[in-house]
């Protein structure tokens, strides 16, 4: 392609991309990405001192390694977190909370069978550890085992019907089984809830009760500081991304998943699985490129 023609092609593509953006994105709602706090850094330094210099019992060392792993995870330092979790488990192999984190990491890596086993271990050690049902349900969802995912997420929803995100994850799974019935079920859950939490605004968008622009206006009005804005954006951008993905608009979905990640709310489920969504979209693109070359 000649340089001038190539320039025209790129310019046209950029113009079309700009036209396809929704109006509200002209005034995009953005937060300052969350950064480690001084308190978190001080706690990490103190933990390091205790682990290095004090004689600890095995239980104390395992617990401290777990707590440091959780802190590393919240800062996005997942390799360090995994190392601490593995060390804690080597000392005390009966820690359900450690298996839960390892199951999440295995899900993010696409190693679904191993993730199922990790979450099974959580529930064997502690049948009341309900977040393992959420995380196993999500792993089953990404693994394409929708009826089993529905069972787990239904049980997790029943534990707190007023939590909008439990309804949303259950809806995402039910949509894969029967889209029309999924909308009806989401509407019923919406009507039964007290709708006191921010996330019900996202449910209203999914049900067609409000527009995307109204959703973003509510988000901006509801945020009290940068932290709450970043958290709400992580949640909202992820579920908007899932919405556009269901419509086949992978480009918009990809942008929204990247915006989810950009807020640095590392310990939110939406941040974790936005990374997986991007990996899956990237794999689709790689597969398409390979097929074009054959």
Swiss-Prot record:
Keywords: Cell cycle, Cell division, Cell membrane, Lipoprotein, Membrane, Palmitate, Repeat, Signal, TPR repeat. GO terms for cellular component: cell outer membrane; plasma membrane. Residues 1-18 form the signal peptide. Homodimer. SUPFAM superfamilies: TPR-like (SSF48452). One of its GO terms (biological process) is cell division. The keyword DNA damage does not apply. TPR repeats lie at residues 62-95, 96-129, 234-267. It is found in: Cell membrane. A lipid is attached at residue 19 (N-palmitoyl cysteine). A lipid is attached at residue 19 (S-diacylglycerol cysteine). Gene3D superfamilies: Tetratricopeptide repeat domain. NCBIfam families: PRK11189.1 (NF008391). The keyword Lipoprotein applies. This is Lipoprotein NlpI. May be involved in cell division. May play a role in bacterial septation or regulation of cell wall degradation during cell division.
């Amino acid at each position: 392609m000649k340089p001038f023609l190539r320039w025209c092609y790129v310019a046209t593509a950029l113009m079309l991309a700009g036209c396809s953006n929704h109006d509200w994105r002209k005034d995009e709602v953005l937060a300052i990405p969350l950064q480690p706090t001084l308190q978190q850094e001080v706690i990490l330094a103190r933990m390091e001192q205790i682990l290095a210099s004090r004689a600890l019992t095995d239980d104390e060392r395992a617990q401290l390694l777990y707590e440091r792993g959780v802190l590393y995870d919240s800062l996005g330092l997942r390799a360090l977190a995994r190392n601490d979790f593995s060390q804690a488990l080597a000392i005390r192999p009966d820690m359900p909370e450690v298996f839960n984190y390892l199951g999440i990491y295995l899900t993010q890596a696409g190693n679904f069978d191993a993730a199922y086993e990790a979450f099974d271990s959580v529930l064997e050690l502690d049948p009341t550890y309900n977040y393992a049902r959420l995380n196993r349900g999500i792993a089953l969802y990404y693994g394409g085992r929708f009826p089993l995912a529905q069972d787990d997420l239904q049980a997790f929803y029943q534990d707190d019907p007023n939590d909008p995100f439990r309804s949303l994850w259950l809806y995402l799974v039910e949509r894969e089984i029967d889209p029309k019935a999924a909308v009806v079920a989401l509407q019923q859950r919406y009507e039964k809830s007290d709708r006191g939490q921010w996330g019900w605004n996202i449910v209203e968008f999914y049900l067609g009760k409000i527009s995307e622009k109204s959703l973003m206006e509510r988000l901006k009005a509801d945020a009290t500081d940068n932290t709450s804005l970043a958290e709400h954006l992580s949640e909202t951008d992820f579920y908007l991304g899932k919405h556009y993905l269901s419509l086949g608009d992978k480009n918009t979905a990809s942008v929204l998943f990247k915006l989810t990640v950009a807020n640095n709310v590392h310990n939110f489920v939406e941040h974790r699985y936005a990374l997986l969504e991007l990996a899956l979209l990237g794999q689709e693109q790689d597969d398409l490129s390979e097929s074009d070359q054959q």
